[in-house]
Curated annotation (Swiss-Prot):
GO terms for molecular function: ATP binding; magnesium ion binding; phosphoribosylformylglycinamidine synthase activity. This is Phosphoribosylformylglycinamidine synthase subunit PurL. The active site is at 49, 95 (proton acceptor). It comes from Azorhizobium caulinodans (strain ATCC 43989 / DSM 5975 / JCM 20966 / LMG 6465 / NBRC 14845 / NCIMB 13405 / ORS 571). Substrate binds at residues 94-97, 116, 240, 312-314, 533. It comes from the Bacteria.
Amino acid sequence: MIPNTPSITPELVAEHGLKPDEYQRFVELIGREPTITELGIVSAMWNEHCSYKSSKVWLRTLPTKGPRVIQGPGENAGVVDIGDGLAVVFKMESHNHPSFIEPYQGAGTGVGGILRDVFTMGARPIAALNALRFGDPHHPRTRRLLAGVVAGIGGYGNSFGVPTVGGSVGFHERYNGNILVNAMAVGLAKTDEIFYAAAAGVGRSIVYLGSKTGRDGIHGATMASAEFGADAEEKRPTVQVGDPFAEKLLLEACLEIMQAGCVVAIQDMGAAGLTCSAVEMGAKGDLGVELDLNAVPCRETGMTAYEMMLSESQERMLMVIADGKEDQAEAIFRKWGLDFAIIGKTTDTLRFVVKHDGDVKADLPIKELGDEAPEYYRPFTETPPRPVLGPSDVNHAVSVADALERLIASPDLCSKRWVWEQYDHLILGNTVQRPGGDAAVVRVNEGPKALALTTDVTPRYCEADPFEGGKQAVAEAWRNLTAVGATPIAVTDNLNFGNPEKPEIMGQFVGCVKGIGAACEALDFPVVSGNVSLYNETNGQGILPTPTIGGVGLIDDVEQSMTLAFKAAGEAIFVVGKTDGWLGSSAYLYTVCDREDGAPPPVDLVAEKRNGDFVRGLIKDDFITAAHDVSDGGLLVAIAEMAMAGRIGASVDGVPAGMPAHSFWFGEDQARYVVTLPANQAAEMVRRAEAAGVPVTKLGKTGGDKITLANERPIFVEGLRDRHDSWLPIYMGAN
């Protein structure tokens, strides 16, 4: 009989985030009342963050296979073949709740956690990205949270030595009480040297590696599976503390130990720490696990079994060592100044047994904790469709020129240079395109291949129509990769939503996942990894549905990558794709008209594929000189961004009869790109487009120092640049 103190009360169960019926299910499973350590273990393994119990049923519907896919969802990261015996290993993951409570450490350890997911697979990290969402800029907390998160990301990534090469930042009042910090890491590995989490072989040593265990982060995973109330600030002790220099040592030691042939299975200690890593290794390998916590290296005295099992101290790994390799593995880790301790063994019992001070603190069935955790088909209601806005439904109170200046200096569309200048985006020396373009481009070793990387989502669209919003997030990632000349190969997703127990929120989740699946299927763009973050609510107010897509593309020859800047005066400007002037749920409507209504633009996936393949062909043929996808803000914002990047003006027109100029210039119709080419190639451009069945329209030509439009005052490029570049530094510099 396992001694059972303290006794388990309904209040204690509720504090651990378990519903009464879940607790009852657990009691029936083990046939007795659990110990406090067992309650802690099951609360960690069965919470939303670790078990995906509300989302699993829908995640299974996503397309996850493809000719390049080596490993899809279910491991620490996705693995995709890029040829020449190499694979790209990548994943995106949220650290939303910790970053709201303690922004510097929360964001920093989010970066650390996702880097570990990548190098656990045997890959050396080569790039990091992020997608950040903050509240209304006027909210008293927003500036402090933004400063802390950006400093935390930069502090960890820069110290670890990985370039942060891209990302996105957005603002909306719906994030006032729950910011989003989605971190993505990308690494390179040899295709025949990928390492997995599933334990193999009975009686093998289970080894603890890395930094010592402390009391930081206990119940971090449980906190990440709950709504916030007014006491959110008091949860600061549940936020982990990171040490990027220890993580750098851990990376080098892990890669060396892998090369030495010592590793049977490896898992990083992330959410729920030792509990989750040990259970996952055993459950995936159909083996039992027995741990002796007296062997765990601790940095604090008197730690209980409960605390050791649930600590989320950072920079730690769990490994199953090949027979007879213990001494060799230990020598490698000691060389790097890291802890190495044999803390258990694999068994054939399918039990998860935890001992401390000679007592059994937990004895549980391992499969039911891990891959057989509860699963819910939660009831949902579909988001009611919004009406389509016609040209007469929008009152254009300002000129096109004034609207452009307002958009370009708005919080969502302004330059994020203030953010990315705090990140080292050039370390390792392989960054070809730095932040500020459509996608980051990072050389693969010495080249000629390169990877293109992006993070994308338009929460406004997902709120208005989750299915179309999910499709659009994937389509925009696909366009951004295409615009730099890459062939899109795979995605990772980070699905951020409110409380799934509310049918309308679950409906948003289901709609977005269906949209993501439809787009990934149509665009041959499989989902290979990802993360779900639910309960992003404070006092009952949920975030905008935010299914962030991290896209990865492959460029065969980095010399052929494309940028968005205008290159020379006198070149022809074309828009590829059809312009209908769609203003519903647009940035123009939100920023200039102070409205958030109307159906978002529909995403025609056949047109996306056709138009994108056409543009990629133009880039490969060296036919065009610049390319930029059209997204937030529409056509004129895209042209302005190209003009500002190249410091060259443009003379443009082309508004069709009967369409308001504001609709033409600021509508957010999908599947569009702006491209430039030598003026003498304009007729050939039209011929190529007709042959491909792609609509194109000539808009004008580059040149001068201003953007000129019919019936509008000229807009000077340098003035636009000043507006674009100054909003964020001025905002962050204000008291």
